[in-house]
Amino acid sequence: MGRAARWFKGIFGMKKSKEKENCVSGDVGGEAGGSNIHRKVLQADSVWLRTYLAETDKEQNKHAIAVAAATAAAADAAVAAAQAAVAVVRLTSNGRSGGYSGNAMERWAAVKIQSVFKGYLARKALRALKGLVKLQALVRGYLVRKRAAETLHSMQALIRAQTSVRSQRINRNNMFHPRHSLERLDDSRSEIHSKRISISVEKQSNHNNNAYDETSPKIVEIDTYKTKSRSKRMNVAVSECGDDFIYQAKDFEWSFPGEKCKFPTAQNTPRFSSSMANNNYYYTPPSPAKSVCRDACFRPSYPGLMTPSYMANTQSFKAKVRSHSAPRQRPDRKRLSLDEIMAARSSVSGVRMVQPQPQPQTQTQQQKRSPCSYDHQFRQNETDFRFYN
């Protein structure tokens, strides 16, 4: 028994020494190759891998020694069983060669001893085999778990290396492309500057329009048609404007800030004036039909939405072109002076109009006047026209 165990230990001891030499040589070569291939791997990961490989080698050696001991025990049991079988064979052969001289009692005793001894040897061999199978299962399970852990650790190291490389690339891209924020700031500044320029140009054009209104001729045009036809024409004009009226209204807000421009309302109509005259109210003449406010509202300040407002033709330029062009032929309308208009209204309504002497206007009243109408051309206050029954 002892000789067999020593023999097995000697064999496995030689194998272990050879395996250690091979492992040492393989580790040296692997470290040299790894240093040449993986130069960019972090130092902490490389140290961890080295320690992990050393620990795994030690554990493998321990398990190999345990397996060798188990196999040696099984071999000892097999040798003992063989020796017992040889002894039984010798006893049986000696009894047979002695002839039939022995008693039956001795034969029965010999058979009984042999059966008991064979059963003992069989049970011992079975126990050894069971222990060997269990040891093999444990070793195989440990090896499988070890391989899985190695693969997981290698994946973690690979992911760390990839993340480090990606972070370096991102840093390089950020270093080589630092001008995006500056370009955005320049764009915003240029937009603000262009808006300021457009607002200043519109203010200048409004100033020119006001200067032109002061020198415009004092002519009033009156339509002899009914109010229904006038409302129809206004509806047609608004429908022809279409969706552009929204954008024109926005431009109108920029060109006429505050309450400087006032539209003619129902209070400026002749019917309302006659009804108010019955109640001894004062009356102010309405602004002409073609006023600067209406032109600014119903005529686009620029032909297209894509063109900026400061490149459009101003109202003073349009008025100059209109003055140089040929006059329109309007047979349905006639031009009357202010006296004829007021006389016609007084004759129709049956009231008497008294016109007092004009009074000079103060500077505050002139500032309150709308720069978009022709009211400042007549130089009359609210008390200029009085209606009596």
Curated annotation (Swiss-Prot):
Q: Which InterPro entries match?
A: DUF4005, IQ_motif_EF-hand-BS, P-loop_NTPase
Q: Where is this region: Calmodulin-binding?
A: 137-151
Segments carrying the region annotation (Disordered) are 347-374
Listed A to Z, the keywords are: Calmodulin-binding, Cell membrane, Cytoplasm, Cytoskeleton, Membrane, Repeat
For the keyword Glycosyltransferase, the answer is no
| Primary localisation category | membrane
Instruction: Name the Pfam families for this protein.
Output: DUF4005, IQ
Q: Name one GO molecular function term.
A: calmodulin binding
Q: Where is the IQ domain?
A: 106-134, 135-157
Q: Which GO terms describe its cellular component?
A: cytoplasm; cytoskeleton; plasma membrane
- Cell compartment(s), UniProt: Cell membrane; Cytoplasm, Cytoskeleton
Outline what the protein does: May be involved in cooperative interactions with calmodulins or calmodulin-like proteins. Recruits calmodulin proteins to microtubules, thus being a potential scaffold in cellular signaling and trafficking. May associate with nucleic acids and regulate gene expression at the transcriptional or post-transcriptional level.
Q: Which family does it belong to?
A: Belongs to the IQD family.
Assembly behavior? Binds to multiple calmodulin (CaM) in the presence of Ca(2+) and CaM-like proteins.
Its protein name is Protein IQ-domain 26
To which species is this protein native?
Answer: Arabidopsis thaliana
